[in-house]
Structures are given as C-alpha cells and as structure tokens.
Design a protein with these regions (language model features):
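ATP-dependent small-molecule kinase phosphotransfer cores
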Residues: 33-104
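Short hydrophobic/aromatic beta-strand immediately N-terminal to the Walker A/P-loop
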Residues: 11-12
C-alpha cells in the first residue's frame, strides 16, 4: 500500500448497544470527519451493482461464508478504495463488533486505524433505550439486552482491552463532544 493512500486516519467506533457510537459518528461528521457504516463499507462494491442489497445481511453472510479475517481485509480494501475515490482524509466508521476483526485491522494498519471503544454502564444505556423507544425499563431490557448478547458473542466487549482510545460516556453530551474533539485534534489536522 502506498503511504499516500487515504484514509490518513479512521476512527473505528466500537461499544455495546446504546453507548453512543452513532452520536460520536454524527459529531465527527459535523467537524469534517466523514461518518461511515462498516456494513456499507463492506458491501460498497456489491451495492453499486445491486441497489436492493441489504448491507447488514450481506455482512453477516460474508462473515459466515468467508470468515472474520477475510471480512476484515475486505473492509480495509474497500475503505481505502472509497476514501481514495472521494479524497477522504479522515473518517469514523460504526460499528466494529468483532474482536478478531479489530485485532486484524490493528495489526495491519496501526498507524491509520484508531480503534475507539465507547464505554457506558448498562443502566445508562438502558435509560437511552427507554428514551429512544419510549418504553419502560422492562421493555428496554427486552430490546437492548439481546442485542448486547449478540455483540458480546462476537467479542465486542473485549475490544475495550485492545482499543487505542477508550471514551467514558457516562457524562453529558458536552463531555462526550469534548473527548471526541480532543481525540480528533490529537490524530487529525483539521482545517
């Protein structure tokens, strides 16, 4: 790979359900760091051929058929291709949930890919689910906990141990934004 290839930096956002990955991605987008979805990056070329493809289903099937390492390399290749075509220097990508993918990506491009784990206690995440879905705590548990279980079966919670950055998202939205801004200034040269 040519060292001039984009992205210069990609923040790979990880964490359990309702931890703030999308909020972080939207904030990054607002300051000039392009927001992307991992499954759409994976299905990028297939979506150009077939507009009706479901990127989530495609990503799951690809992992089943080819394995996590193949998926991780395809992600790297597709993201590099997209960023070079669009002259994207910096991006954030949601949602990295496979521990083995994170390890592989980190081993291949540690200087470009910043694995970022957003940490939030379960009770706070449940509150967010209650607000988002307009339900009580029991219904929120029925919605969120099965999603957490799936993510944890892939090792999403273990990504925290290998992350380049761990963001504590227990505080206010302003505190989250402050941490993200500090991180972007450390890794990016934004204009």
């Amino acid at each position: 790979m040519n060292t001039n290839d984009y992205p210069e930096k990609a923040f790979l956002l990880s964490g359990l359900s309702e931890c703030g990955k999308s909020t972080a991605g939207m904030y990054f987008d607002s300051i000039g760091i392009k927001r992307m979805k991992l499954v759409k990056v994976l299905a990028y070329k297939e979506m150009k051929k077939n507009k009706n493809i479901n990127p989530y289903e495609y990503a799951v099937e690809l992992a089943k058929e080819k394995g996590e390492i193949f998926v991780a390399q395809k992600f790297i290749d597709n993201l590099t291709d997209i960023c070079n075509r669009e002259n994207t220097r910096y991006c954030s990508v949601e949602s990295l949930i496979y521990r083995r993918n994170a390890e592989y990506i980190k081993s291949k491009m540690p200087d470009r890919f910043i694995i970022t784990y957003i940490d939030m206690p379960e009770k706070e995440r449940l509150k967010r689910q209650m607000i988002r879905s307009r339900v009580d705590i029991e219904e929120a548990k029925k919605i969120m906990l099965p999603r957490d279980k799936i993510k944890m079966s892939h090792g999403a919670h273990e990504i925290k141990n290998i992350a380049d950055v761990v963001i504590n998202n227990e505080g206010s939205l302003e505190e989250l934004y402050s941490q993200l801004l500090k991180m972007s200034k450390k890794y990016c040269k934004l204009e």
